[in-house]
Swiss-Prot record:
Membrane disposition: Multi-pass membrane protein
Residue spans, topological domain Extracellular: 30-72, 121-136
Keyword field: Cytoplasmic vesicle, Membrane, Transmembrane, Transmembrane helix
Assembly, per entry: Interacts (via RVxF motif) with PPP1CC.
Keyword NAD set for record: no
Coiled-coil regions listed in the entry: none
Side Cytoplasmic, residues: 1-8, 94-99, 158-225
Localization, UniProt: Cytoplasmic vesicle, Secretory vesicle, Acrosome membrane
Natural source organism: Homo sapiens
Protein name (Swiss-Prot/TrEMBL): Transmembrane protein 225
């Protein structure tokens, strides 16, 4: 069975969350998520869900909900990476509540991003029947789905870290109770020892008293003679 420490889990968690943030920022700067193709296949236009103004092939700006969800996912990813970094450098306590919070944050950020991508695909299919003939997905779109995977892995790692810390706490409590039992047994033995050692002392003292009495009696006899 492979043993994984908490520090290695925290390091992998920071690595995956950092990659998720980097790819999200890269997706904001690059606007070639999808290539829209017109009906005569002459006009081609790049499109991204981060665009505030829509191109001529897609005049209606109905991606406000998608942008809000992707913005919330980006903000939560930044917050997750910050908390994981502070926890790795011991700036915040490493308890199960922080680990549960990072787990919820990871899964919620991944679900928000996945839901935004599904909505964006739905809008592309709706626009295909009205504004353009077809579209082609580029590699940036696949990196967005890779971000969903990274955030899900962060949630699983946070759950694993919480489980390991909980099991280690129970083992420490059991070890502490065993030590307390051993200390109590030792104290009982220490208390019972003086009672056993007191008996020979009393015998020795009685013997000395009897010997003194015999000496006194012999002295009295000699003086009488």
């Amino acid at each position: 069975m492979v043993h994984v420490s908490n520090r290695s889990i925290q390091g992998m968690n920071i690595l995956f969350s950092s990659w998720a943030v980097v790819l999200m920022v890269m997706g904001i700067t690059l606007d070639k998520w999808v290539e829209l193709i017109s009906e005569d296949e002459r006009a081609k236009m790049n499109h991204s869900p981060w665009m505030m103004c829509c191109p001529a092939l897609w005049p209606e700006d109905d991606l406000k909900v998608v942008r809000i969800m992707m913005t919330s996912s980006l903000g939560l990813s930044f917050l997750l990476n910050l908390i994981l970094g502070m926890k790795f450098t011991y700036l915040i306590p490493q308890n199960k509540y922080i680990q549960l919070f990072t787990t919820i944050l990871s899964f919620f950020s991944g679900i928000s991003l996945l839901w935004a991508l599904i909505l964006y695909h739905n809008k592309l299919k709706q626009g295909q029947s009205m504004h353009f003939s077809s579209y082609r997905i580029t590699w940036i779109m696949y990196t967005a789905y890779l971000n969903v995977f990274f955030l899900s892995v962060c949630g699983v790692l946070s759950l694993l870290e919480c489980k390991l810390s909980t099991s280690s706490c129970t083992c420490l409590n059991i070890h502490k109770s065993d030590n307390e039992c051993k200390e109590s047994e030792n104290s009982i033995e220490d208390i019972s020892l003086p009672e056993c050692t007191a008996m020979p002392r009393s015998i020795v003292r009685a013997h000395t008293v009897n010997s003194l009495n015999k000496k006194v009696q012999t002295r009295h006899v000699t003086w009488a003679l």
